């Protein structure tokens, strides 16, 4: 009798489990799991990465921008149709932009679900958050370029990270300018070690004062090294180069007494090679001040109402034209000319490509813009 009872009990449990399993199966069929828009974008990116791992011959060979259809991922059975991924998938469209820059590939999912959700670039978000002004602090516009000026507090971006006390901590940057849908950022921290701009023997000076020719300098090598070792203070510092645009740097020369009104002399000459990292220029620093007495790079008034003003020393890549060794550097609240063989910090600049997309934040130091 006890065996019969035990047998019936086991049978009941098995039957219950089968019914439960069948119910879960029916539930999954009639109530499929849907994802958020952000989760869907991540799924599309992962499916695209797998697609090209399986089809490496399909990767673009030349630098540029390319498109991949969402349907190609569905046909490869790497992702479900959009109406099975998103609850409103029938009203959405999706595509993938592939960007090749040197040896780096970027995969950018683009979702369009009308008013409900559309993948948004960081540039669009910044311009939506900031009305262009013509006085005081804020976002200015000149000849198609947007730039921040004054004591602004909403132009912070978190990009890259390092580990501190077993916690992932983001690097903070300030937005300097926006041009051609690309965003120039300046790091709020230095790279962790001082470098000389150039220490070669200068035959013109008969001493090891270095030369102020950027294309043949040592600082260009230091900037290039940042591509593999971004920060010497943190060994595990990470920067995603696929989000950046390699650019020819503005290396035109100017004099300490050249007035701000002369404009961006630095960009009249560009570096021979393209770089992912650069430095701020004296013109950009002067332009960021709203003090009317900021008339040239040596004006102490330039530190007033200027979000780019520092308390640390830093190199620029800008040289003077009146000698073969002088370099602009920021120190003691002003720009001065130093010999190239001097050791100073680098606060690097980068350019986010037009494919940097908004992923959260309001631009404050407490809640900086996030990108993906």
Regions found by a protein language model. Name each.
Residues 60-99, 125-126, 245-246, 263, ...:
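Extracellular/periplasmic head regions of type IV pilus-like filament subunits
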Residues 117-372:
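Collagenous Gly-X-Y triple-helix signature in extracellular proteins
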Residues 1-43, 364:
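Gram-positive cell-envelope targeting signals
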Residues 27, 31-66:
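Conserved hydrophobic/amphipathic alpha-helical signal-anchor segments
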Residues 54-59, 79-84, 324-326, 355-359:
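Substrate-binding/catalytic groove segments of enzymes
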Residues 47-54, 76-77, 178, 188, ...:
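Structured segments of extracytoplasmic/periplasmic soluble domains
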Residues 65, 102-104, 181-182:
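A generic structural signal for beta-strand entry/edge sites
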Residues 94-117:
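Long, compositionally biased
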């Amino acid at each position: 009798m006890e065996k019969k009872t035990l047998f019936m009990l086991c049978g009941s449990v098995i039957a219950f489990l089968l019914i439960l399993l069948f119910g879960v199966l029916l539930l999954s069929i009639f109530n499929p799991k849907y994802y958020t828009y952000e989760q869907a974008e991540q799924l599309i990116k992962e499916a695209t990465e797998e697609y090209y791992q399986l089809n490496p011959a399909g990767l673009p060979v030349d630098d540029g921008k390319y498109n991949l259809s969402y349907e190609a991922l569905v046909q490869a059975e790497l992702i479900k149709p959009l109406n099975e991924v998103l609850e409103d998938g029938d009203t959405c469209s999706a595509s993938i932009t592939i960007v090749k820059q040197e040896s780096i590939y970027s995969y950018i999912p683009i979702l369009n679900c009308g008013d409900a959700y559309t993948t948004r670039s960081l540039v669009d978000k910044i311009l939506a958050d900031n009305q262009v002004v013509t006085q005081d602090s804020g976002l200015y516009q000149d000849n198609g370029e947007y730039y921040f000026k004054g004591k602004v507090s909403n132009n912070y971006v978190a990009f890259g990270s390092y580990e501190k006390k077993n916690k992932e901590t983001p690097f903070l940057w300030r937005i300097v300018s926006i041009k051609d849908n690309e965003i120039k950022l300046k790091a709020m921290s230095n790279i962790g070690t001082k470098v000389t701009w150039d220490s070669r023997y200068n035959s013109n000076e008969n001493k090891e004062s270095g030369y102020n020719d950027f294309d043949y300098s040592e600082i260009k090598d230091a900037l290039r090294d940042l591509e593999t070792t971004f920060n010497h203070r943190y060994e595990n510092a990470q920067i995603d180069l696929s989000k950046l645009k390699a650019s020819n740097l503005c290396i035109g020369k100017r004099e300490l007494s050249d007035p701000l009104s002369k404009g961006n002399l630095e960009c009249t000459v560009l570096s021979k090679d393209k770089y992912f990292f650069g430095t701020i220029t004296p013109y950009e620093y002067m332009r960021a001040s709203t003090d009317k007495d900021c008339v040239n790079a040596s004006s102490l008034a330039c530190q007033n109402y200027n979000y780019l003003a520092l308390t640390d020393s830093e190199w620029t890549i800008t040289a003077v034209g009146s000698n073969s060794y002088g370099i602009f550097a920021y120190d003691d609240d002003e720009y001065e000319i130093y010999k190239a063989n001097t050791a100073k910090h680098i606060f690097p600049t980068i350019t986010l490509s037009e494919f940097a997309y908004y992923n959260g934040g309001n631009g404050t130091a407490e809640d900086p813009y996030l990108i993906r």
